[in-house]
Amino acid sequence: MKFINVGKIVNTHGIKGEIRILSKFRHKDKVFVKGNKLYVGKKKEDFIINSYRYHKIFDMVTFEGFTNINEVLYLKGEFVYVNEEDLILDNNEIYSGKLIGYDCYVGDKYIGKIEEVLNEPASDVLKVGKVLIPYVKEFIIKIEDNKVYVKDVRGLI
């Protein structure tokens, strides 16, 4: 299994076992769904989501079988993961982390391999050498055969 980090448990909320997750993950609507499985901590202990709501900047989750704050306190400070195989995206969506290692082109010109995907508040950003490319439809033309084609935007390269 390949795990994708989707956030960190920063605290509990109330006394009924609800936890606060701080997450910048782009596809929250596909992850934080009742019945989905999340993995927590270094040991990747699995939990089933019982409820979800968004509150201020936090993703608030309860897990099946946990109804008391004392049962979830030990999770505080742990990272939360989803199994990549469980992450089902819409037809044309690709999880940005999968793009690492893809070749990047502006038109027919090869500009390098995608080295890293930065999770920024506005959008994910693809790092190709010293070039940073926002992972938004205005910049990405198409993705196929392990290649990403980006628009030739003045000042980008």
Segments (PLM) and residue ranges:
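Short Lys/Arg-rich amphipathic alpha-helical segments
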Residues: 1-157
